[in-house]
UniProtKB/Swiss-Prot annotation:
<dbReference type="InterPro" id="IPR002733">
    <property type="entry name" value="AMMECR1_domain"/>
</dbReference>
<dbReference type="InterPro" id="IPR023472">
    <property type="entry name" value="Uncharacterised_MJ0810"/>
</dbReference>
<dbReference type="InterPro" id="IPR027485">
    <property type="entry name" value="AMMECR1_N"/>
</dbReference>
<protein>
    <recommendedName>
        <fullName>Protein TV1384</fullName>
    </recommendedName>
</protein>
<dbReference type="InterPro" id="IPR023473">
    <property type="entry name" value="AMMECR1"/>
</dbReference>
<dbReference type="InterPro" id="IPR027623">
    <property type="entry name" value="AmmeMemoSam_A"/>
</dbReference>
<dbReference type="Pfam" id="PF01871">
    <property type="entry name" value="AMMECR1"/>
</dbReference>
<dbReference type="InterPro" id="IPR036071">
    <property type="entry name" value="AMMECR1_dom_sf"/>
</dbReference>
<feature type="domain" description="AMMECR1">
    <location>
        <begin position="11"/>
        <end position="200"/>
    </location>
</feature>
Amino acid sequence: MDSEQINVNLDIGAKAVMLARRAAAAKLNNEKLPEVPDDPIFHEKHGVFTTINTYPDNQLRGCIGFPEPYYELGEGIIKSSIYAATDDPRFDPMEPDELNRVTFELSILTVPQEVTVNPEERPKAITVGKDGIIAVYNGASGLLLPQVATEYRMSAEEFLEALCEKAGLWQGCWKYKKVKISKFQAIVFGEIEPNGKVEQR
């Protein structure tokens, strides 16, 4: 399923990002969690990731999500946003006063599909800027969202190498058949500035 088949317009995207921000704010301020919007897509199961970046220097502050459609989208947004704000092991939990110095970005994912070509051909099967990728091997796993390759101007091979590192696997792990590589697409919405206008990316 391509990202174009996920029926999400900018209005829905803005609601999704707002839900993520409100969920994180509620958790950090010990308040009641926000209600999920009534729009049907929020009650369909989709994979979702919340990315929190500092503003204006755009440094990662937290990123956690669910690659598989385990949860209804609304619930997944709330959970991933709270985890990104409080439970990303790479960072200390956010403080409430940080909320006005960060932006929220939401990635709504298609169902991951295994890349079944011969391992050496995997780079050709990945479209940089469109595909996100997942590696799984022997209990270790890692995921990179599509926008990572764009942001760092990676080739498909560099993207796969970065994935191996993210998964804690060895360099060139993607060349081995026993390492499962899957790809997915995402529709991405994010704030231009804290509490600001939302754009599709």
